[in-house]
């Protein structure tokens, strides 16, 4: 029971005095003190001493706060505090290649990161024995056990919050949204817990949220959204959206290494339709570096995800169009130099 509002502007005039009196009699602090007295565990002298120590601690810390210089908000300082510092370390791939699909590249990259990071936990609906609806984690339980590959209830807000808790304990977490649409029920912990944790209290949010998204697979309006725009303007989040298997594997490794929260979008229509030669070893790719897929003088096309393939098909059907084609790969950070250059 709340005896007063949670902040200065919240009043209690609407609460009957009788109700306040009834709950005041149940005050656990007062009752605990009375219990200690009755058990002869707390003398009057001890009580006075404890209260003096508490008041002294409060006064000392208040003085420290009041003696500090006035806070000056400087734009550069504010922006520098949005993300936890991350020093990207490039890991080059080996020369052995395998022609695989986008879905295979994501699965392979996730598995290799599980092997690299003992403290990495994957969570999501039906991802354990069943292997997830897209089978990306198929066989992971046998390889890593159910403590690290965890089925979750249908409660996205709880799953994202649990991932944040793992990060605070020094672990890493990858959350699979069964479909990107479902992130709406976990929106608050994504944009208010994960995104703001470093800016507010210097705490990392070492969480990757995998987001199977997009239409063209007959999944209907509640399983086909491409909702990356919800997050690209939320300070503290990073947003990745690869179009090719090679990029997906390397960018996923970087996302898991990054101590900041990353939303990793995967267009479902590309899962089993796009093939590419991909290195078999573990490797990383940097965020914020777009790929120039085609050079031309007439027009510049900037896209990401499935849009890259739509552009490639259009240019193939219209050879008279001489265009630059830029694949952004990451939307936050955004490679503005590639766009405007």
What kind of feature is each model-predicted range?
Residues 1-3, 54, 213-215, 266-271, ...:
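Glycine-rich beta-alpha junction loops
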